[in-house]
Amino acid sequence: MTDVSAAAGGATAPAETAATSSSASKPLTNGANKTSTAMAAPTATPTTAATASGAAEAGAITSVAGISNQVKLEHHHHRQSNNNRPVAPYPPVPAAKPKPTPTPESKFKSTSREPGMSSSSSSAQQDVDEVARLFEEKPEAFEKWLTERAPPEALSRLQEFIESRKPLKRPSVTSDLFQQWMSASPTVQQKSPRSLSNSSASSTLPECRRHLMDLDEGELFMELIRDVANELDIDVLCHKILVNVGLLTHADRGSLFLAKGTPHNKYLVAKLFDVTQKTALKDAVTRASAEEIIIPFGIGIAGMVAQTKQMINIKEAYKDARFNCEIDLKTGYKTNAILCMPICNYEGDIIGVAQIINKTNGCMEFDEHDVEIFRRYLTFCGIGIQNAQLFEMSVQEYRRNQILLNLARSIFEEQNNLECLVTKIMTEARELLNCERCSVFLVDLDCCEASHLEKIIEKPNQPEQRPTRAIMPGDSFDEKKMRNRFTVLFELGGEYQAASVSRPSKTELSTSTLAQIAQFVATTGQTVNICDVHEWVRDHNQIRAESEIDSTQAILCMPIVNAQKVVIGVAQLINKANGVPFTESDASIFEAFAIFCGLGIHNTQMYENACKLMAKQKVALECLSYHATASQDQTEKLTQDAIAEAESYNLYSFTFTDFELVDDDTCRAVLRMFLQCNLVSQFQIPYDVLCRWVLSVRKNYRPVKYHNWRHALNVAQTMFAMLKTGKMERFMTDLEILGLLVACLCHDLDHRGTNNAFQTKTESPLAILYTTSTMEHHHFDQCVMILNSEGNNIFQALSPEDYRSVMKTVESAILSTDLAMYFKKRNAFLELVENGEFDWQGEEKKDLLCGMMMTACDVSAIAKPWEVQHKVAKLVADEFFDQGDLEKLQLNTQPVAMMDRERKDELPKMQVGFIDVICLPLYRVLCDTFPWITPLYEGTLENRRNWQDLAEKVEMGLTWIDHDTIDKPVEEFAGCADEEIKDIEFTVTTLNCNQQAQHGAGAGGDDSHTPEHQRSGSRLSMKKTGALGKAVRSKLSKTLYNSMDGSKPKTSLKLLESHVSEDMDDKSPTSPSQPHAGGSVGRMSASSSTSSAGTVVDKSKKRSKLCSLL
């Protein structure tokens, strides 16, 4: 780095003395073109484009007929008139002899020969004239020659010529320039050859300068402003500014400094230094990059200008104390006059400083005119510099976003390798921020096995007992350090050094200054940007300085946090490559890297935890598979048992019941179904494997009240009956029959006695695992688990294609038992049936048919005989009531009616609704298509009548359930016949008109004074008037229910007295002229002792009295 004070003034190229006057003294060529000094470097300017287009035009014409230089000049004049702007390096036509704008035809017809043309050029021009005349006489032949016989090279050049005829636009932020920046290195901008190479333009530089010197001051000023107005390459722009300022002020050389740093630590960086009008852009950029000059604000001439924002004009540099003559002494160049001026943006902030040295026109100092021109031109240059910086920032931001996107992609690509991920992040950070070293410290996160076991044995809803690593306000620094200990260190050195991973010891961490700084950041959670490490360590007594910081100048250290804002590591950058401190922009970029590093570390740890959990799951599945599989003794016993015929189990009948079958008989019945369908031999199922699988399936059903193994057996038997008796096997393949029977047996595996809604409400693991058809998906997974268990795969002999097919059938069939799926598929099935569909072999139609068959089998208990059906219904209701109790207890919510134990009397009514909504429509449409399963439909109709009759009796006030559980059928209530009912007072009301007429004379009354419940209709009502138990009232209701059926009462009610209350008669006025519409009211009281009248009523009299009332 060049000394700061030496950079304040002076020059470095003795060979490039003030010699531009020699070139300026040469005579100017007449008609020098108006052009910009951009020809010093071939950038994206009109000058370069015009030069290239002129060459393209000349090449295109020459390829056709050997065009001369005169044609090229005429074409250039045509371009100039079209674009209305100067083009270099061709001189314009003298003003005294204006030439009209040539047309394309005139180029070929022109035969004039201007002075200076050679004889060969004259001959070429004659050839052009001859060809032009031929083209004019026979244009069709020329067109045909172009389209059929013209060489491809000629056509290509001609196309380029035509394209070049279009007017040029002013240069802007073209895609080429943007792509040039995109392909540049993140740390060192790689300039394109067009920007850095000015070899082609250097040869035309004297002509450009001579042309510009021929302009008046106003035209020159505007031309130079146009030259820099749209330039976005900061290096090219600065070079243009210095060259143009030299032309405007006749300065020998100049330097341009750009302001950098934070608001509290600003400095100047020499973008280009000692640039003369002959200095090539590439040389200037190379020299500035090789020896970067940094000048703090307030130091030297340029530093003072930046500090004060005031211009400095020095007439004799050696007499000014701020001037440093060391560079002059090294180079032999003598600095006389210096003019240094600030460059500000639109807000008035310093963005740079421009400095010019020595006059070349014989003057010894810069006068006021030079100062004014310099100030005016730098005003416009400030706008251009800020635009170029904004563009550079946008490009850098784009590069940064691309790097961050790559890092995001790397997080998922390297999630199984933390070392590779962190190394990649550090490499990207080092290259983008241009630093020497990069380190990442990882904090111990208590991932040891002991803490894991502590976590497992923690009780639910209990505070965490493990020591926390949270930093408390009252903790000392040492206590905070003890809570954050680094366990892994990633280090990345220079560009050619490989990354290293180590596990530092406590001694190494306590003796390393860099580690202590990282420990400080992890403890405080603050970002540290250290410009001077030695000074920072002196200010923090708790950190000890070691010898390793001798080579460390600047450090940027930042915490890495996870989603819970807990520090999991520290990222550290050491020393910028150019020796300057880290800026706020660097900290902002590094923050993004720290965030991605935290995401990567967190994601990797999550991935490792997931892998561990998967391993634990495999172990658990192995254990579960072992315990879920039937024992070898049970398998051997079932294998040796004799299997009865299907008729002995009544498997062909739709009235099958399992009540009389023992558990072993249920397994034998399943085996008989497989044997009867010829599945064992058809698919080569080993008999012992089939027996073990059946026993394992039975073992994996929970002992719930309804959805247990026997329910699965009934569903499978109904499917067997539909296939055999219902003759539906003709629509199925053997593989589909196998899948359907397996699905029926497994469709409720591991049922917990609760439905999908309960799983969702309680947010159970099953609901998290399966968002739709929760239990059905679990049943299928259990089915797969059993099949995958050793010795249970009954599909082992199937081909891969058949295996996939049968598993698809099993999955679809089990999921179809979800009534939500039934309602989705029902309309499509009904539409097919209504359209007279008879071909069910299509994949979608077969899936619909199997789904409807599964639902029909699942609810087939509704079609069983009444003595079976009402028992099963009570089991279902009891299971539902248990779920309702759980909802009240766990969720503190009121369950729906069918699960509310308090509304159990509504069960008959709900059964009727279930039959009407689901069962009857399904069986009706199936019977229409497959008439052999009509018994299912007829049985459902019969049970509906029974449930409807029971529902009507419940509406009359009869209670059909007399206790909390409903495992007893209605008929079993007869066992209470010998019990005596005591202390019952009830009222019986009837609207029998004949009886009303008979008793009206004695108890007649006005209808308006009759209670409404006595006028509401012919019904029997029970009303509790004392401390009467619920069981007693239920028994009485049952007795009356039997009496209403005409059967003999089974309970001997000892009615001791029947009388009419005198109080009621007194309060009910009667009128002989009006009929008694309210009915007769009788109050009867039963007591164990004799009544007040001493009259005892026996059972037969009681029955006669009730019958007469009813």
Curated annotation (Swiss-Prot):
Residue ranges of domain GAF in the record: 233-385, 417-601
Propeptide: 1108-1110
Pfam families per record: GAF (PF01590), PDEase_I (PF00233)
Alphabetic keyword roster: Cell membrane, cGMP, Hydrolase, Lipoprotein, Membrane, Metal-binding, Methylation, Prenylation, Repeat
Disulfide bonds: none
Comp. bias regions, Basic residues: 1100-1110
Segments of skewed composition (Pro residues): 88-103
Subunit structure: Interacts with PrBP.
Family: Belongs to the cyclic nucleotide phosphodiesterase family.
Protein name: cGMP-specific 3',5'-cyclic phosphodiesterase
